[in-house]
């Protein structure tokens, strides 16, 4: 009797749940990621690398921020340089510039996203300033653990080597904690915090530099050739296998000394085929693992320092190393030396560290041919898909300055069809005094998402058919019927097709519904093209007939 009662309850509950699901329209989705435009999407503007008084005066800057806000920018991101905040000595902090910047942001009624920039400014693409990291830092150790050394022996000091985790734990921890205390009075204007994870603020090795002859579009140079790095790799290998004899068995080698366990002696050959060997797989796992551990460490330090005071998301950046991607001779020959061998595993570290991820090059297109073998769009799609699968909040940037509408449209395609929660425009000077570019940005990317219900009645579907909509803007798939159409769902209660769709408020849109058969072919289109001019700022519904 008890079992019969439980069975009846389960049946009744199932019927009720089914009935409720039919009454409530489901969130519609783009075919690629199952989410459509992110309802939390916001646009950000990247501040100049130099201090504001070196570029303009504070009053003009505040007016610029008001203008940016009117054009759809929610917040301004800004680098606060370690080499400026603690240049005079260990724990001799000066946050006066950060506080003055925050005051101007507050005066303008805007938000800011501070970047705790523990790397140098200067020497990377687009840099127009020169702020090295504090000189006293290099006295913290007497060995070579604090800096990088490449295959060719080039020493790089633009940021601390993540292998120096003891120094990083102390110095970054102190910096983060002091920053939180100094900026507490301005917590209301801080929307998010970004952490520098390496060169140019990106979680990577300094594997492509002009000083090392590895600028774009060359292959990268590995950066594990200090004596400290060699010893760390050796220790990792011996811990994994237990003895030199077991190492030789696994690698198929005949090493006669533990000292012979070394990084690749020939980076070119390694990238051609050495990476396929067990030795190569181990080396790349260790090499990327250093970045993963660094991600977890700075995430831990940041959450400990910032969560209580600011209670905002914290993020870090992965670089868009898009060249040599599909080189048939050295595939991914720029990514591997940067520390990017397994993006899925790297993103797991972001997830573990509770960090949002920012990725670059949203404005670029694939070329995939000699000599660049550049595939930025494919790379963006791969990273975005992985981040969405793992539930990691995803933000984007352009890699180079944008100078035309077409590049904005490419950004919109990626941002609105791959669930980006935000896009940061690089950089302030490019749009602030260019009304044409600012207007294009506002229309295409400076948008406010709003959930609207789309209803289509009298659709002549048969069993196995599905109804989609597509339209004239990136948020609607730009008339695409394969990758980006937004799926509607059949409502048996109302006998129509409907769904909740995130749309750009106060923008004019045009769209049509169409039917796809079970095999994916387009059967027919809605007769009359629909217009919504403009999309309301408040949630409502749009109903049309087939």
Swiss-Prot record:
GO biological process per UniProt: polysaccharide catabolic process
SMART domains: CBM_2
Consequence recorded when altering residue 194 to F: Reduces activity by 64%
Domain CBM20: 444-546
Family matches, as CDD domains: CBM20_beta_amylase (cd05809)
Single Gene Ontology MF annotation: metal ion binding
Positions with a binding annotation for substrate: 79, 119, 127, 317, 322, 360, 398-399, 427
Catalytic residue positions: 202, 397
Annotated catalysed reactions: Hydrolysis of (1->4)-alpha-D-glucosidic linkages in polysaccharides so as to remove successive maltose units from the non-reducing ends of the chains
Disulfide bonds: 121-129
Necessary cofactors: Ca(2+)
Record: residues binding Ca(2+): 86, 90-91, 171, 174
EC number: 3.2.1.2
Pfam families recorded: CBM_20, Glyco_hydro_14
Record key words, sorted: Calcium, Carbohydrate metabolism, Disulfide bond, Glycosidase, Hydrolase, Metal-binding, Polysaccharide degradation, Signal
Annotated signal sequence range: 1-30
Bound cofactor: record note: Binds 1 Ca(2+) ion per subunit.
Subunit structure as annotated in this protein's UniProt entry: Monomer.
Family per record: Belongs to the glycosyl hydrolase 14 family.
Name listed for the protein in its UniProt record: Beta-amylase
Organism for this UniProt entry: Bacillus cereus
Gene: spoII
